[in-house]
A protein has these predicted regions:
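Bacterial N-terminal signal peptides that target proteins for export
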Residues: 3-15
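Intrinsically disordered, low-complexity Ser/Thr/Pro-rich tracts
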Residues: 9, 22-33
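Bacterial N-terminal signal peptides
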Residues: 14-23
């Protein structure tokens, strides 16, 4: 009987050791498999810089939507899922501008997921701004729609947001659906 008690005392220790060993082996095997990666990228204050080269001066433009397009092509190839966001001031407010039509086309073609408008978009004036937001939301062969998120762009009469304040994006990461909340609160004054 004493031998049986001695055996029963050792049995849980042996089982626990076996379980820990199995967990360590499983963890080592899982470590060989790289974890899925999510990239969240943002741009801001692009000011209508569409091209790599200034069309007037011929000088190289360091930060432009063409550079973003090239960089995002490489980044999307290196991660399992990506979100691309713009924090506003995307449009050119110079003397020669088209109300943001070219910028809307660029944002859609590059594959931006959302834009949070800032001062630059509001300097367009109400009609051009609304046209810019509508152009972002168009689905066409020129690219996917871009969500406009702005919880602090309020209707003057109702004081309710003109655009959605937030969006919950769902991306596939490995075998899991991951949800990412993006809240749109942009700078409304310079």
């Amino acid at each position: 009987m004493a031998r049986m008690r001695h055996f029963l005392k050792r049995c849980p220790a042996v089982l626990l050791s076996a379980a820990l060993l199995a967990a360590a082996v499983g963890t080592a095997a899982a470590a060989d498999t790289p974890a899925p990666t999510l990239g969240i990228y943002t741009t801001g204050d692009m000011g209508g810089r569409l091209y790599r080269e200034d069309p007037v001066t011929g000088e190289a433009v360091e930060y432009s939507y063409q550079n973003v397009a090239s960089a995002m092509e490489a980044e999307r190839a290196s991660v399992d899922a990506a979100l691309l966001l713009d924090s506003g001031d995307a449009v050119d407010n110079g003397l020669v501008q088209d109300g943001g039509a070219a910028e809307a086309l660029a944002l859609r073609a590059i594959g931006y997921d959302a834009l949070v408008p800032a001062v630059g978009e509001f300097r367009l004036g109400p009609e051009a701004r609304d046209d810019f937001f509508a152009a972002l939301g168009e689905a066409s062969e020129d690219g996917a729609p871009v969500r406009v998120l702005s919880g602090n762009y309020l209707d003057e009469d109702t004081q309710s947001p003109e655009e959605d304040a937030y969006e919950v994006f769902t991306v596939e990461l490995g075998r899991r659906a991951v949800r990412i909340g993006v809240l749109g609160l942009g700078a409304m004054e310079a």
